[in-house]
Curated annotation (Swiss-Prot):
Membership in a protein family: Belongs to the NTE family.
Primary gene name: NTE1
Name listed for the protein in its UniProt record: Lysophospholipase NTE1
Matching SMART domains: cNMP
Lumenal side: 67-81
Residue positions of motif GXGXXG: 1243-1248
Top-rank taxon, per record: Eukaryota
Amino acid sequence: MKDSTEALNSIAFAVDTTLSSILPSSLAPPSAPPATSSFLKSIWYAFWWLWSMVVFKIMNIILLYIPSKIMNALSINFEITLNLSSILVALSAIITVCFLVVRYKYLTGYSKDTSDRKTKGKVNPSASNINLKNQSLDYVDQKKGHRRTTNYLDEFLSAIKVFGYLEKSVFHELTKNMTTQKLSHDEILYLDEKLGFSIVVEGVMQVYTRITENSNVSGGFDPDDDNELNYEKDDVLIIGNQRYQLLNEVKSGAPLSSLVSVLDLLKPVDSEDSTSDMLHSFNISDDDNISKIPEISPISLPFQGIHAGAKDDSVPPSPIIRPSKTKQLYPEIVARPKSRPHKEHTGHHLHHVHHSGATIAIIPYSAFQRVQSKYPKATSHIVTMVLARLYKVTFNTIHDYLGLTKEIMESEVKLNTTSSVRGANLPGYLFDGLLDKIYGANGINEASLSRKSDFQRASSVNLNKQKTTLCDAKSSRYVLLDSRLKSTHPGDLLSSVPLSRRSDYYQTHSHPLSADDPLVRSAFPSSKTLSSLSSPTSNLKRASSNLKFENIRDRSFSDDREETEETSLRIAVVESIFKILGISEKSTAMRNLSSFNSGRSSVSSSIVGLSNLMSADDKFDTNAARVRFDSYNGFSSTATSISRSSTPIKFYNTINQNQLHNHHMGDSVSGINISTLSRQHQANRNSSPTEFNFANVKSDFAKCLEIKSYGPNTTIVEQGSFNSGLYYVIDGSLDVLYRPSNHGEPSSNREDNLKKLYSVKSGGVAGYLSSVVGFRSLVTIRTSKKRGVIVAHISKSDYSKLMDRYYFLQLPVATKLKKLLSPQILTIDYALEWCHIPAGGVLCSQGDLANGFHIVLSGRFRVVRNKSDRYQGNTSDDDILGFSDTSMDCSPSSDINNEDLEVLGEYGHGESIGEVEVLTASRRTNSLIAVRDSETARIPRTLFEMLSLSNPSIMVKVSRIVASKVVYKDVLDQSSRNSTLIPSSTASHISNDYKTITILPTVSGLPVREFADKLVSALKAIGRNVIALDQASTLTHLGRHAFDERLAQLKLSGYFAYLEEEYETIVYICDTPLKSNWTSTCISQGDCILLLADAEDDVVATGIGDYERLLINLKTMARTDLCLLHPEKYVEPGSTSIWLKNRIWVQGHHHIEMEIIRKKDENSVKKRPNIISELASKIGSKTNPSIKSTLEDVRLKAISSFVKLNTSFVHSDRYKAVQPHKNDFLRLARILSNEAVGLVLGGGGSRGISHVGIVTALERHGIPVDLIGGTSIGSLVGGLYAKDYNIVSIYGRAKKFSKRVASLWRSVFDLTYPVTSYITGYEFNRGIWKIFGFTEIEDFWIRYFCNTTNITNSTMDIHESGYSWRFIRASMSLAGLLPPIAFQGCMLLDGGYLDNLPVSEMKKKGAKYIIAVDVGSADDRTPMNYGDTLSGFWVLFNRWNPFSKHPNVPNMMDIQMRLAYVASVNALEAAKKTNGVIYLRPPIDNYATLDFAKFDEIYHVGLNYADKLFSSWSKNGKLPAIAGMVDKAKIKSGDDKKVLYRRNSI
């Protein structure tokens, strides 16, 4: 026992030792505790033994048992026996499972992202327009609230356009002596515009004009009568026996005085004529000796108790007015505050209380005189502004709208019949010498004598001889006559004595004659061209002629230099023109301009007129420094220097209106208290004339003078031209002809409608108004039919430059013009309002009173209607009183929701707004919002009614305008009624004929200049009169500080307005940095903004460009189109929607092929990652370098050979790289000019294959296509053409689709249980997807749309965005055959059920010409008569009876089909009658709807039909004049007609 125990202990020790060495420390048995009992030791070893046994067992199972079992299982042999049927079933099951997995998991991957796609976040353009509009309205409200914090009087004065551009010093000079006058509700103001300039500060003033006895207005116009025209009780005012007609209502902040009256306030008082001028304005005869009328206390009018307002010591008493002179002394203009009725509760009664009154501010006459004396250049700016208003507002309205052009031309008739003109003849020796040289023995020689060639060439011996003579006599004072050079001249005193043309007041200088002076040529060319005399370009001073006296002995010489006959002639002509224009050297305005330095003195220069302030000993005289016009009409300097804070005085006299109603009108009139009518003008004269060299002015004018000779019946100026100039008739006469504007008149009859107005004789001037005012020529100027004419011509550009240089001439010229204007024109000018509406401003709101209508002078307005009946607009008038703040008072931004607004259209330049509401005395039906900074001329209702009574032709013309608008509206309504259902996804048509186009880049570095050049060339090619403006070209006209100074805004606005008058389209090129003022100007001036972007720039596509951010901050209302520039005609699928996703300010987009030259180090544009390229680069990096270099060499050789092959193919005669009719810039130009060509392809199943042939014929004949729309099969062919714009790809893809649809097996496998449809639509869907892929409609190169029938909402939907295959499939979904496409919860079917030929929708897109191809089945209109009952057996027998006379009765399927296409048939008939539609229907009636297997046959039917038709049209001249097919720019320039297209074969 002991031995066994020891043996176990030894074994345990050995195992313990072994395990301790083998097992890790964590599994090793722990050492026994020292000094333990044997019992514990035994237990310890037993536990350890059990643990060891468990470990060994586990190791045995893992290492031995499990592997042995696996080996035994693998070594077992067994057999499975299956029969053939089991194997086939198993294989069928496996194949079916695999097919279902591939079919429904992988092959339907094209539609996994298109189940309910909302066009990737693209917002409806109409909604974005309204959203931006409301933002603009909120911005306007914020701006208006900010403006109200300023001084109200300064705000009113700054808002007036005349004073808005002046410097602060000039502005303060005008306003420091301004006074105010308060009027009670019963006071009538006698408005004397010669006392000062008045502005309404508070309240509303009603302005009345006097009605003369011989006027038609007074006849039968009784205010007590219930007259239709007199629906306002305040239209007529009676003072004494004089009747006054309401002219206008002037609101707070608007000028009460006429802006033309500023000319009288600025005119210096230098003669007694001022007194007569003032009295003449009140019809007081100059023969009346006003000084004999005693000045006594004011007396009452014939009606008792009427006085001239409150008595004031500063106002002199009025004279006694004798009864015989009463009617002459009634003022022309009176004004009174407008009554405002308010309801007031007094106890139990309701009373109407009239709370009214007004406050006016007056800038006195003396303030204008101080400005005229101290700031002559600022005076010229005011005069320029007055003329600009006269041109833009008055003349435009009178000529274009009212049709009173003859009234305007009466001023030129007066000019040429005044005594000053009759005395403005040339000296006899100059006149005879000129006639002797032009009308020689050979007759009239009309040789064109260029100004440059006159002094660069020597053409005869006589000229050389003359040159020698002149060089020897440089210091002579003789006038060298050309007659002395003739060998046959016998000589006389005039040829040997000194001659002078100097008058008593002209200081003259002479000029040496050039060697090749045209006046001394021995012979003139005989060609019928213009002959002109030009002056040397030297800066030497010239002589002037005395225009009144012919006594040569009284003349002296002006200089030490010799005066030639040419210089004498030129100066004499200039002096004659000056006398006609009203420019006199003796005038006070000329004497005040001492030390004048042309173009160098600033507006506020303190040295202007400095010599007037110096005494004889060159010391400053404080007394002389005072303004010489401190008193006027009895007003002392203390009276006129009352500040604004002083107590208001009675500046104007008034009478109490209440006394008018209490007085009994009698026949006798004893007197009237009008104190301002008889005041005499007293002005201090400067006795010592100042030194001023007026000869420089005449010399510079003479340099620009051209003497021309025209033959008989030669048109010199065409009506409507801009660059006419001033024509002074030296000999002969000019006929002034006028052609009434009639847009519907054929051009061949326009020549017959020319009517002669008057003739300009010798000594007269033609082209006066167009030169002085800057207006386009209203008449045609032509020489007489019997003989020619010799004229002296100053071009309009030269005249404008000289007037800008010598700005002090503008005041006398403008004053002379005002005297020539008729009283009717001045009345119209006084009543017309010049409205300035900023971008986003509201011209008028829906619901406003229509108290006037507007004519758009510049800018653009968007018409918006609120569809909610709960909206009520303001009841205030819709007028905009000359400044932006008043226009915002009717802004309904807080009451308008986006969903309630509807954009109806836009008004552009020259269009009129609101006549219907005015004639019907109703409220505004729409709201008008300015798209950009705009200007309108407002004609008040009262002025229109007054002019209509005196000139019935105005009412006739306005009635025609209104009737034409009504007819046009009826046409639109008729077209909308023809389409029974209104499309749910399109807005009303907005005209694309934009006046101004802005080209703006998204980021810097884009080729803006190159893009603009190509677009301008395209616009010219389609026949548009276009000009491109960039900062450099604009600075050329306006100066280098055009966009930095406040004054430049006036010139800038006038320059842009002039360009809008002269050109059809203006392209603004934004080629400046982001913070430049020109960038903001371009954005604010654009009717349409073209936003350029690089299509491959992913950074900008997902973000926003710097220029776009500025565009958003400026809150422009203009339409914004995104132009994506591509290096080639290819758009990566899905790339366009990335650009349009977040750009809600973009309403459209265009794909343009244009190469962008990028710099090598440019990293701003990131290319899209290409998986294959990245994989190739990774593999190439790990490849052996030798293999890599070999492959690179092979690749380079392949590329070079491909380039050579492509080059030879491109330059071959059978192919042309860029076809002109596919020019993207011509397409863009047509769209922007409303000249787009649309292609509409109808539905018809397999018959639509003929569309491919027709498109091929269009390509062959070079007919461009700008817009494409389609239905059913037409949507498929149209989508292919819009996607690739290539006939080759269209043919191949359409044929591929036809083969798939015609496949019988594909149709059989696609059959399903016919609950909704016979087939599932899978094969049909996949066939469409195979040719379109994941391309979206936005990716199509040409703008495209297709229509579908929404059977959920019972509407027709138009699709212009989204996956193309999906909506094309929806447009082709024939009910019963294919299931509807589900989109956003709606079911979409074939669009042919509502409109199988969507011409109306294409018309909404702005297409002018529409090529509509109809391939639908022919309508069976056979009459049926089978009685009231019908037996099915009889119908069956009738079908099989060959002898039956009854037509076959349709079955149930046919009836359902006809019922489904009822709306489409009506829409087709309306489409045929639409203007501009080219209706085509190829002979395809013999083909069924599903005959897709006959592709080639149907294709050739369409091709042959269209090819023959277009060829015959081209041969017979019936093809419409589509813009771009012929280069109209070259035709205008006189080149031969060049066709831009050529035939191209496939």
